[in-house]
């Protein structure tokens, strides 16, 4: 009933759903690359098939059935013939053929590449060792050869380094959020919308590797931001940008427990543009009934609303944070899997890995520590960062070289401006500035530790600021969790004002409004005094607070800093292996490794800083690392625009000649060059909307690299022997498979403290991965989509009996319009 009625609905507006891509992109796709088109996943008329929500391992019968299906699919892929579509037609240029031969791709990957060059948005799946990373590199090379603007990203730093890109979060400006509680979960959902729209406005293709480690909201937030970027097509998925995703959901996936509840609904979803009505499983069924009852409706608005209700109902019933359960991922990408394994030349080892992938640990794999010889230089893999840190520390104790402690410090950069307005320290704004005066309200009868009173006080003070009624003035009201001698609650009010106002003007207006609203004779004023008690109104200059703020921040967040792998103080020795934790330049990024060969002062090693460095510190910050006082008062020397990289702007280092500001010299593995690693200023986590000033931590972005977490190695092929110690393993699907599949031969693998009960498989991921079509099936589906597109563009009528008509809804992205 639902299938037939929805087909009738979609026939009435199918012509409206097809639209050409950007003209600029079309002009550069003259060699057979078509306009943007979206493709569908699913074999049964485009219906969504949400994966089961169980987290236990699959049963033996289901595993055997899926295993047989996988074997059959791969055999079909190896024997299937070409389909005559896209760039596989006779009109394919000789330039493309020469490009294919130069890339050294096998037949399967060449056919996948033709789909990409034909404009298909793709998800490329496949097991470990099939060459997904090399496939991504080949795709990027071919697209850039056609003068397309391609952005290459990955979910982790090491995976990004492996494909020559950057992390997804750093590329699009998405804040990495630790979501351990409901408050942070809400801010995580909001932050997803903060994508770089300037980048989205000009890019042609976005490539994301290791997509399984991203939350579904990252992909959906990218879609919302791209459709709202300047010059984009709002009604097309991703605004018309071709998106290529790559990954394996049978490897490590995003941790759903930390980012979203099992039902997936609630306020967090509404924050990023979902429907405001709270559709439950019952109301989702009601929405389907509504669609059936309105089958004869021809009004476009009602039709679009009906389709949106279907998609939203599915989303709220199946959302768990996993990308393969997102309707956007299921409906707006053409899916395929690569089957030909390239990494592992050991056939017996490959068979063991395939069984491990499906949840079966063979006896040969269990005895790997006994069968294979011990390698003292083997890379250690652990499940937790704590175990990695302990092993790295033990290796450091074995070294006899010079040792140096790089102690992290907290830096209070200044007062934080209200959301959407310039920071007080940001002088780039033309008509907005921050006041030097700050209003401090001391609620002497309310305790600072009470979250309830913090909310009530901030709400009350915010209402008073609103009643001031001054246009062009924005306020920032915060109750920071600073430690101090006074246990009572303090609220800070800071103003960002237009240039036409004096900074004292809003302070005077607020004081007058405070006197009237709090100390007046009205019933509301009397009620406020009874409710909040004694309050002291005080005005302070921001500079007088800097010392207190820095000390309070360090005390309040010392545990956070020392428990953070990046922000904590580092102890390094000459001769120790290290890994870079942040992007410094195009050559040296998060995940780059090397060996410490010495320590030098800043003034003697500036020529060793990376060229074109992305991040830099001001003179003032480098002076704070020294025990000597600041000599120069030239404010221009502290500009954040100064660079270490030889661009002619070295004033920041010219005025810092302190011998006790030390940096490590690292011989990088990538090119063998000696590089001075600079100090970095990184944001203090969990401070958004909770603090009075912008606070950062100045730290050294290096850690010892004798051991890694399994998560860090996903996407890599290791040439060294590895030792996987499973002691202290936490429940994590696919983690044993990811670790074991990093090497090419069984002789390179040793596993200890492992048992069969540690090998678990996510049923939904197994179901999705086993149902992925091979390249031949993807080609057939893409050809069908192109034929449907031509029919609609030519004004031809589509028959309701056509099973592909329902899939026309997959061209429409209006179900996620941001309101």
UniProtKB/Swiss-Prot annotation:
Indicate yes or no for the key word ATP-binding: yes
Q: Which UniProt keywords apply?
A: ATP-binding, DNA damage, DNA recombination, DNA repair, DNA-binding, Helicase, Hydrolase, Isomerase, Kinetoplast, Mitochondrion, Nucleotide-binding, Transit peptide
* Gene Ontology molecular function: any one: magnesium ion binding
Any Pfam family from its record, for instance, is PIF1
Enzyme's top EC category: isomerase
Locate the DNA-binding region by residue range.
734-754
Transit peptide: first to last position: 1-84
Q: Which GO terms describe its cellular component?
A: cytoplasm; kinetoplast; mitochondrion; nuclear lumen
Highest taxon above the source species: Eukaryota
Catalysed reactions listed for this entry? Couples ATP hydrolysis with the unwinding of duplex DNA at the replication fork by translocating in the 5'-3' direction. This creates two antiparallel DNA single strands (ssDNA). The leading ssDNA polymer is the template for DNA polymerase III holoenzyme which synthesizes a continuous strand; ATP + H2O = ADP + phosphate + H(+)
Cofactor(s) listed: Mg(2+)
Task: Provide the residue positions that the database annotates as binding ATP.
Answer: 126-133
**Where is region (Disordered) located?**
76-101
Q: Where in the cell is it found?
A: Mitochondrion matrix, Kinetoplast
- Enzyme Commission number, as recorded: 5.6.2.3
**Does Chloroplast show up as a keyword for this record?**
no
What does the record give as the function of this protein?
DNA-dependent ATPase and 5'-3' DNA helicase required for the maintenance of mitochondrial (kinetoplast) genome stability.
Subunit architecture? Monomer.
PANTHER family in alphabetical order: ATP-DEPENDENT DNA HELICASE
- State the protein's name: ATP-dependent DNA helicase PIF4
Organism, scientific name: Trypanosoma brucei brucei (strain 927/4 GUTat10.1)
